[in-house]
């Protein structure tokens, strides 16, 4: 390390894992797509899951025909349970922007005063709770394959209710998550539009680049 042969990034990979847990409900939600699988009608299912970090309460587990449409799922969750302080996800293209820029989803979260957080690349332990949730889902729910997307929605909804209200959790003193979770006191609201002053107008293309003559500068896809 003294000779510059070991990078800080490489050193960080080998640090001992540190468990974390927020001290109250809705301080952090974890979200991720469960790996897709084949349904009985040969279509593919991409379950999107949202988990409260403190209580392990499953906010949403929603089977989808594609790894997209996350804003609608979160919007329904915000309407039912209120707003979290932050949302932790991996660096998948649905959640994380290109070259450090922001996605439309991240911009929307920030407009709602929600901090988007991303785990370290190739370090799934950061989202250990939702990874463990996915293992439980695979063991208890996906032992039998749903017939189609509608059948998947029914089975996922039933299993989610059992997981939240009946299934005891060791980290909660053998209580089910529903006995610990409380909805957020922050209700969903409509963000105020930005009011920009007068000045030079420059167009940002669909890929987030701003052009000055022959020079291209990357800003963000949300501009």
Cite the ranges covered by each PLM segment:
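Basic, flexible linker segments flanking DNA-binding modules
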Residues: 1-31, 36, 103, 176-185
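Residues at helix-coil transition
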Residues: 2, 79, 164-165
């Amino acid at each position: 390390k003294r000779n510059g042969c070991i990078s800080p990034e490489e050193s960080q990979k080998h640090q001992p894992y540190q468990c974390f847990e927020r001290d109250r409900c809705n301080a952090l939600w974890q979200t991720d797509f469960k790996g897709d699988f084949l349904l009985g009608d040969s279509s593919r299912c991409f379950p999107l899951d949202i988990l409260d970090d403190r209580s392990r309460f499953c906010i949403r587990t929603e089977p989808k025909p594609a790894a997209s449409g996350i804003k609608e799922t979160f919007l329904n969750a915000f309407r039912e349970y209120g707003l979290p302080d932050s949302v932790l996800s991996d660096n998948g293209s649905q959640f994380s922007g290109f070259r450090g820029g922001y996605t439309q989803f991240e911009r929307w979260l920030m407009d709602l005063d929600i901090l988007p957080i991303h785990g370290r690349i190739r370090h799934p332990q950061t989202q250990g709770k939702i990874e463990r949730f996915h293992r439980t889902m695979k063991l208890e729910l996906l032992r039998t394959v749903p017939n189609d997307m509608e059948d998947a929605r029914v089975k996922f909804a039933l299993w989610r209710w059992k997981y939240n209200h009946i299934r005891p959790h060791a980290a909660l003193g053998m209580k089910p998550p529903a006995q610990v979770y409380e909805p957020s006191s922050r209700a969903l609201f409509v963000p105020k539009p930005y009011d920009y002053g007068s000045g030079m107008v420059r167009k940002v293309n669909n890929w987030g680049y701003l052009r000055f003559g022959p020079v291209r500068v990357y800003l963000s896809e949300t501009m």
